[in-house]
Design a protein with these regions (language model features):
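The feature captures the beta-strand-to-loop junction immediately N-terminal to the Walker
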Residues: 65-67
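Conserved ABC ATPase signature
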Residues: 174-178, 182
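A short, proline-enriched helix->beta-strand linker immediately N-terminal to the Walker B motif
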Residues: 193-197
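Catalytic Walker B motif of ABC-type/P-loop ATPase nucleotide-binding domains
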Residues: 199-202
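H-loop/switch region of ABC-family ATPase nucleotide-binding domains
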Residues: 234-235
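Conserved ABC ATPase "signature" C-loop
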Residues: 252-253
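ABC ATPase "signature
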Residues: 258-259
Length: 282
């Protein structure tokens, strides 16, 4: 383990002390939150995920990198049960959500799945905010309508999140009145309002606007400091290198390399080295 690791805060780089890194490792080496074993997924004749296995520990930040079309987003959608798997096992805190039976993937009953789904949050690449809802309405809608939280409690949660994410003056704004970075922060607030144990990000900085990319990366860094368990699909190689506890490289539906940032970026196999070199030159 290195003595210090650079981290992202806004558009600047800072250093994370050895003590801070050790604290992160102490948190992550205990409880397994999410476990996926031998996951398979096909769309028609196209095999998108081929025998993928992944475990995520409490407080861990896992970055998933790789070329477009490698199955990264599909992996996230299977983990959050937005897509049904065709094979393999999915469990959270040891409770099985899906498993193989007689060569087919079987899911738990609706009541069990509803409870398990409460543990996951997904921040979409394109925000997916309701355009006809205000920022406040976007954030409180799911807690009230899905989880049965009172409107008062949902608003209290929302105000705390808006303040935390620097959006307290945008509660009554509509998505079209916000910048890309602000919309993505609202999307993060909406996911956090459900109080998930694991937060998934699908290309959170895909728009390549340096100003709002810095805004979003700063929020993710803040969540990491608070030991939020996160799985992040990203093309931001420097970000993945600096912030992650573990990095996974995927290509053609397979995990080609997995390890700490030091292992993946410091000693990549030939294919990973080629990919990293090409992406970091862009």
């Amino acid at each position: 383990m290195q003595d210090a690791r650079e981290i992202v805060r806004g558009a600047k780089l800072y250093f994370c002390s050895q003590t801070e890194i050790q604290e992160r490792y102490e948190v992550t080496m205990n409880q397994i939150y999410l476990e996926m074993n031998h996951i398979k997924k096909t769309f028609g004749k196209l095999e998108v995920l081929k025998d993928i296995s992944l475990s995520v520990h409490k407080g861990e930040v896992v970055s998933v990198i790789g070329p477009s079309g490698s199955g990264k987003s599909t992996l996230l959608r299977c983990a959050t049960m937005l897509e049904k798997m065709d094979g393999g096992e999915l469990s959270f805190l040891g409770e099985k959500a899906a498993w193989e039976e007689n060569g087919k993937c079987v899911y738990a009953n609706k009541k069990q799945l509803k409870e398990i789904r409460k543990n996951f949050g997904l921040v979409f690449q394109n925000f997916n905010l309701f355009p006809h809802y205000t920022v406040m309405k976007n954030i409180i809608d799911a807690p009230v309508c899905v989880d049965g939280v009172s409107k008062e409690e949902a608003k209290e949660r929302a105000w705390k999140l808006l303040k935390q994410l620097g959006l307290s003056d945008k509660a009554d704004a509509y998505p079209y009145q916000l910048s890309g970075g602000q919309q993505q922060r609202v999307s993060i607030a909406r996911a956090l309002a459900l109080q998930p144990k694991v937060l998934f990000f699908d290309e959170p900085t895909s728009a390549r606007d340096p100003e709002w990319t810095g805004e979003v990366l700063r929020v993710i860094r803040q969540l990491a400091d608070e030991h939020m368990t996160m799985v992040i699909v990203t093309h931001e190689m420097q970000f993945a290198k600096e912030l992650s506890d573990r990095v996974i490289f995927m290509e053609k539906g397979l995990v080609c390399q997995e390890g700490t940032p030091e292992e993946v970026f410091g000693n990549p196999n030939a294919r990973v080295k080629e990919f990293i070199g090409r992406v970091m030159q862009v």
